[in-house]
From Swiss-Prot:
<feature type="disulfide bond">
    <location>
        <begin position="159"/>
        <end position="202"/>
    </location>
</feature>
<keyword id="KW-0150">Chloroplast</keyword>
<dbReference type="GO" id="GO:0042802">
    <property type="term" value="F:identical protein binding"/>
</dbReference>
<feature type="active site">
    <location>
        <position position="322"/>
    </location>
</feature>
<protein>
    <recommendedName>
        <fullName>Vanillin synthase, chloroplastic</fullName>
        <ecNumber>4.1.2.65</ecNumber>
    </recommendedName>
</protein>
<dbReference type="InterPro" id="IPR000668">
    <property type="entry name" value="Peptidase_C1A_C"/>
</dbReference>
<feature type="disulfide bond">
    <location>
        <begin position="293"/>
        <end position="343"/>
    </location>
</feature>
<comment type="similarity">
    <text>Belongs to the peptidase C1 family.</text>
</comment>
<keyword id="KW-0809">Transit peptide</keyword>
<feature type="active site">
    <location>
        <position position="302"/>
    </location>
</feature>
<keyword id="KW-0456">Lyase</keyword>
<dbReference type="InterPro" id="IPR013201">
    <property type="entry name" value="Prot_inhib_I29"/>
</dbReference>
<keyword id="KW-0934">Plastid</keyword>
<dbReference type="GO" id="GO:0006508">
    <property type="term" value="P:proteolysis"/>
</dbReference>
<feature type="active site">
    <location>
        <position position="162"/>
    </location>
</feature>
<dbReference type="GO" id="GO:0009699">
    <property type="term" value="P:phenylpropanoid biosynthetic process"/>
</dbReference>
<dbReference type="Pfam" id="PF08246">
    <property type="entry name" value="Inhibitor_I29"/>
</dbReference>
Length: 356
């Protein structure tokens, strides 16, 4: 029996080596892992030893996937193969960005949209913004991470709470810029407590409305005292745990990228929202653009934080912090084409003025 088991393990290692030998340098799977001991025997026992099965087993190991049945393994494998084909076909188009395998590669677009994106929000309240141009020379490029005021990338999990992470990201940056100290603020408080300001917890909301909530609430608690759970809950705000207060919130005029660039360039990071469409969930690097996403106030379905801008290969871009963890995109960040209000990135932009 032991001899048969040893033979089987040697066969798996040999087969994996053959599969790896055929990889192209730009294969989207290469970034997962190439160690033979990363193979999940349960997955290979169901799927066999074909090349895609090895790819899928390594993917599952890399991202800590757990499937409850053979049927689930087969289902997720089928989706994974479809996404892999989509990635390869997209990357062959020689676009300004590339896609790659990440933690969402075993989800259909519908599953991803349901679990990670909030409902579309109406941003028409920003039709006339209150951002004021201040004196100063606009930098050619900007990356607020270099100033040390951008907090670490977080992960919203399977909750459409992106708006809370965009909100706390802007507040954390403003706090650090003001005090020179870092902090982490409570997304869960916003999920649980901000519904009176037209926000809907895991079903979506807007940073501009969250800033107003924090202003009238008298502050937002720290992450340590009100930790993130990723589900709708009962409000448990405590005034003694407040980390930051909001004096006012500033809205960028709807669609005005010149205003947005001025704010990001000379003020600080700005909360923005845009429409995520199929393919963006598998973004890896480069300057993202799309001819299928919308730009209208009712199109936006995901809130993020613009932390800078620049030019890559002749294409101007926004540098944006996401809330899908550091395994996604470029260590949790992405670049979005600048100058076309791409996917509505300047449709729903705002930033807070804070106090301690």
């Amino acid at each position: 029996m032991a001899a048969k088991l040893l033979f089987f393990l040697l066969f798996l290692v040999s087969a994996l080596s053959v599969a790896l030998a055929g990889f192209e340098e730009d294969n989207p799977i290469r970034s997962v892992t190439q160690r033979p001991d990363s193979i999940e025997p349960a997955i290979l026992g169901v799927l066999g030893s074909c090349r895609h099965a090895f790819h899928f087993a390594r993917f599952a190991r890399r991202y800590g996937k757990s499937y409850g049945s053979e049927e689930e393994i087969k289902k997720r494998f089928g989706i994974f193969v479809e996404n892999l084909a989509f990635i390869r076909s997209t990357n062959r188009k020689d676009l300004s960005y590339t896609l790659g395998i990440n933690q969402f590669a075993d989800l259909t677009w519908e599953e991803f949209r349901t679990n990670r994106l909030g409902a579309a929000q109406n941003c028409s309240a920003t039709a006339h913004g209150n951002h004021r141009f201040v004196d100063g020379v606009l930098p050619v490029t900007r990356d607020w991470r270099e100033q040390g005021i951008v907090s670490p990338v977080k992960d919203q999990g399977s909750c459409g709470s992106c708006w809370t992470f965009s909100t706390t990201g802007a507040l954390e940056a403003a706090y650090t810029q003001l005090t020179g100290k870092s902090t982490s603020l409570s997304e869960q408080q916003l999920v649980d407590c901000a519904s009176a300001f037209n926000n809907f917890g895991c079903n979506g909301g807007l940073p501009s409305q969250a800033f107003e909530y924090v202003k009238y609430n008298g502050g937002i608690d720290t992450e340590q005292t009100y930790p993130y759970l990723g589900v709708n809950g009962i409000c448990n705000f405590k005034q003694e745990n407040v980390g930051v207060k909001v004096i006012d919130s500033i809205n960028i005029t709807l669609g005005a990228e010149d205003e947005l660039k001025h704010a990001v360039g000379l003020v600080r990071p700005v909360s923005v929202a845009f429409e995520v469409v199929k393919g963006f969930n598998l973004y890896k690097k480069g300057v993202y653009s799309s001819d299928t996403c919308g730009r209208d106030p009712m199109d936006v379905n995901h809130a993020v934080l613009a932390v800078g801008y620049g030019v890559e290969d002749g294409i101007p871009y926004w540098l944006i912090k996401n809330s899908w963890g550091t395994n996604w995109g470029d260590n949790g960040y992405f670049k979005m084409e600048l100058g076309k209000n791409m996917c509505g990135v300047a449709t729903c932009a705002s930033y807070p003025i804070v106090a301690v």
